[in-house]
């Protein structure tokens, strides 16, 4: 036969020839001594398995760890700032500045008993040059704006009293006769006193319209 007809050797035969594993006869004679398990001798293990077990790194420090641990990086130096505080006398550290002769630190004592009372409104006489308005006030009535004087504290006529107690002229709206004197409402030449409702203008101005004063009927004055 030629060499091509011979089958190639198997993987186990190659290992036996190289001495990696033992033959079946030698392996059958060895039995385990503990509970039927194979012996833990390294002679029955393959050479590559034994070499892999023996090649495990052992810690050089002798702490018993199977694997060596990487050493920790060195600690970084911490920059320490110089301490500017110097132990000394506390009175010198927190001493107040010396008083200056130009600065007056004395303050007048606060008077807690002092209080500001609102001045009470008094019945002021009517402004000079204006006659006192005498409305027909009912008994016991007191106006809080003018105090029954007809004029407020600002000197302007009281519209509240004029609307409630004022009388008006009998006005007829027509063309004036020839030669009549034409004056504006509230003119000083018109007899009477100034109307407190319209303040002598004879009309009331609203946001969108203007109407004639209902107290003085547009004259600007009311009779005494």
From Swiss-Prot:
Natural source organism: Schizosaccharomyces pombe (strain 972 / ATCC 24843)
A GO cellular component entry from the record: cytoplasm
Keywords: Cytoplasm
Compositional bias of kind Low complexity: 31-52
Main location (coarse class): cytoplasm
Role: May be involved in assembly and disassembly of the actin cytoskeleton.
Extent of Pro residues compositional bias: 1-10
Region (Disordered): 1-110
Chain intervals with Polar residues compositional bias: 53-68, 77-94, 101-110
UniProt name for this protein: Proline/serine-rich protein C17A5.10
Sequence similarity: Belongs to the HUA1 family.
Induction: By stress.
InterPro entries assigned: Hua1-like (IPR038910)
Superkingdom of this protein's organism: Eukaryota
Protein location: Cytoplasm
């Amino acid at each position: 036969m030629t060499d091509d007809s011979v089958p190639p050797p198997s993987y186990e035969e190659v290992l036996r020839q190289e001495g990696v594993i033992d033959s079946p006869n030698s392996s059958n004679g060895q039995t385990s001594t503990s509970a039927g398990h194979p012996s833990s001798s390294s002679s029955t293990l393959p050479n590559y398995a034994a070499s892999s077990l023996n090649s495990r790194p052992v810690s050089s420090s002798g702490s018993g760890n199977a694997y060596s641990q990487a050493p920790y990086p060195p600690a970084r130096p911490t920059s320490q700032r110089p301490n500017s505080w110097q132990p000394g006398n506390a009175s010198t550290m927190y001493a107040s500045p010396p008083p200056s002769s130009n600065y007056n630190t004395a303050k007048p004592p606060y008077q807690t008993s002092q209080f500001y009372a609102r001045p009470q409104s008094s019945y002021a006489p009517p402004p000079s040059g204006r006659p006192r308005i005498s409305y027909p006030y009912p008994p016991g009535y007191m106006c809080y704006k003018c105090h029954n004087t007809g004029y407020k504290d600002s000197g302007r006529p009281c519209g509240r009293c004029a609307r409630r107690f004022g009388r008006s002229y009998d006005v007829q709206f027509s063309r004036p006769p020839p030669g009549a004197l034409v004056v504006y409402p509230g003119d000083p030449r018109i007899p009477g006193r100034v109307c407190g409702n319209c303040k002598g203008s004879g009309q009331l101005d609203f946001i969108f319209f203007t109407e004639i004063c209902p107290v003085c009927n547009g004259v600007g004055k009311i009779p005494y």
